[in-house]
Each structure stands twice: as structure tokens, then as C-alpha cells.
A protein has these predicted regions:
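A glycine-rich, basic-preceded beta-loop-alpha segment at the flavin cofactor/substrate interface
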Residues: 224-236
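Fold-independent oxyanion-binding glycine-rich loops
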Residues: 133-136, 161-163, 179-180, 195-198, ...
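Alpha-helical interface subdomain recognition
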Residues: 2-79
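Short helix-loop capping/hinge motifs at secondary-structure junctions, enriched
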Residues: 111-112, 202, 228-231
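A generic structural signal for well-ordered coil/turn residues at beta-strand boundaries
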Residues: 127, 143-145, 171-173, 189, ...
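Flexible, small-/acidic-enriched active-site or ligand-binding loops
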Residues: 200-227
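A short core secondary-structure module
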Residues: 165-204
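Glycine-rich flavin
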Residues: 47, 51-54, 60-167
Length: 236
């Protein structure tokens, strides 16, 4: 049923929104509130809320209009996060984490055509991005990465990292992850890489019986990815 709901939401994702942002956010918040208790009790992904998020085209609201988004500001994004979070903590947190990753790509992509195409696709298909910044023994030290980006022939890269936590990783359409710049780089010499789901596989390592915001489905995974080197997010 969940897969069917997502498919139905994406079927209409290309249509431009006809309602203003507050109206759309209010509608999504109502759906999130209706399922908040079930989401937290069962520690399950808020599928109904994100069906509504996609239907109301909220995932690309801060992306520039030239790339298919609405070009809205961080204040607008914060308002939606606040409204969704009041209705369902997990829904609000997932939406906020997604928007942070979108903002990272926007801030640093420059003239990178590959990343621009990723944002176009995100808006057109209403794709959800996850974040992977914790790893192995590093725990909460997001300024240290064990796993290096490995450069291959033909402008390709590979990455294999043990992520101690990827929130909603099994439900996301892509992930933005930290990695060591290269095998001979120090652990603090990091890059960010953006992958679509077709670029990687996830193998579950561990669960997390969380207290609060249980619908974020934060679990540990081994992430194995192969993609274009152009998906490394440029430095400012």
C-alpha cells in the first residue's frame, strides 16, 4: 500500500502548484497529525504525510525557478518545518533534513551541470533526499570520515561506507553523504557527494529503538555507491 501511495503521488508530481504555500502546508500538516500517533507508536515512516508532501509539491520549494522549483527563501522553509513539526515530529524532522541537503547542493553547486540536473529532477519527480554524515567509529563527529571516495576510469567514483545512522534511508530517493576526499587524505579532509537511489545499495547493519521522532526510521547501513565524479559537490 505504501509503495502504491508514493507512486500515485509522483504520478501527478509534474503539475505546478495552484495553491499558496501556507494553504499547502496546512493541508499536509492535517494529514501528518492524523497519523502522528500511529507513526510514533509503530516507529514507521510517515508515508501518508509524505504522499501529501509530494502531492502539494513541497520538496523543491527553495530550488530556483530556473531549475523547476519555486525559489522560496529559508524563512518560508522554516515556516513549513515548524507547521509540520507541530503536527508530527517525525514528519517535520524528515522535511527539515531533506531541505538542509537541498540547500547544501544549491549553495555549493556553482555551474555544475550534473548537480543542476539533479535538482531539476528532484523538483519534477518530488524526490526525497536523506543525509548520511555519521560513520563507523566516528559517531557524532561529522568532521571526520573513514571511507574515501575512490576515483575510477571514465570519470566515475565509488564509495563504500558504514553509516552508523541514516534517517529514513530505506524510504529516500537519494542521499547526500560525507566522505574522505581520497584514500591518502586525512580523515578531516572531506567532501560531500550526492547520489540518487539508482547509484547505491543499502545493507542494514543495525536498528535504533528511538525515544521520540521514531518515524524518522534512523538505522545503520553499509552504503555502496557508484556514480559520476561530477556528483561530488564543489567547494565554495
Amino acid at each position: 500500500m505504501e509503495a502504491q501511495q508514493v507512486a500515485e503521488a509522483r504520478a501527478g508530481a509534474g503539475a505546478a502548484p495552484t495553491e499558496d504555500l501556507p494553504t499547502r502546508a496546512t493541508a499536509v500538516a492535517a494529514v501528518a497529525a492524523n497519523h502522528a500517533i500511529a507513526v510514533d507508536s509503530a516507529a514507521r515512516f510517515p508515508a501518508e504525510a509524505f504522499q501529501a508532501v509530494r502531492a502539494k509539491r513541497l520538496l523543491g520549494i527553495q530550488v530556483p525557478k530556473a531549475l523547476g522549483g519555486e525559489g522560496l527563501g529559508i524563512g518560508d522553509v522554516a515556516d513549513v518545518c515548524y507547521q509540520l513539526g507541530q503536527a508530527c515530529g517525525s514528519t517535520g524532522m524528515i522535511f527539515a533534513m531533506h531541505q538542509i541537503k537541498v540547500a547544501c547542493i544549491m549553495r555549493h553547486m556553482g555551474e555544475n551541470a550534473t548537480l543542476q540536473r539533479m535538482l531539476r529532477r528532484l523538483c519534477a519527480e518530488q524526490l526525497l533526499l536523506a543525509s548520511s554524515t555519521t560513520e563507523g567509529q566516528g559517531g557524532g563527529n561529522i568532521r571526520s570520515s573513514e571511507a574515501p571516495v575512490e576515483h575510477q576510469e571514465g570519470g566515475r567514483i565509488t564509495l563504500e561506507r558504514k553509516a552508523s545512522v541514516i534517517s529514513y534511508g530505506a524510504y529516500a530517493d537519494g542521499v547526500v553523504t560525507t566522505a574522505r576526499r581520497a584514500a591518502d587524505a586525512v580523515a578531516s579532509d572531506q567532501v560531500l557527494v550526492a547520489f540518487f537511489k539508482s547509484d547505491y545499495t543499502l545493507t542494514r547493519l543495525q536498528g535504533w529503538d528511538a525515544l521520540g521522532m521514531r518515524g524518522t526510521c534512523s538505522e545503520g547501513y553499509t552504503l555502496k555507491a557508484s556514480a559520476s565524479a561530477e556528483q561530488i559537490i564543489p567547494e565554495p
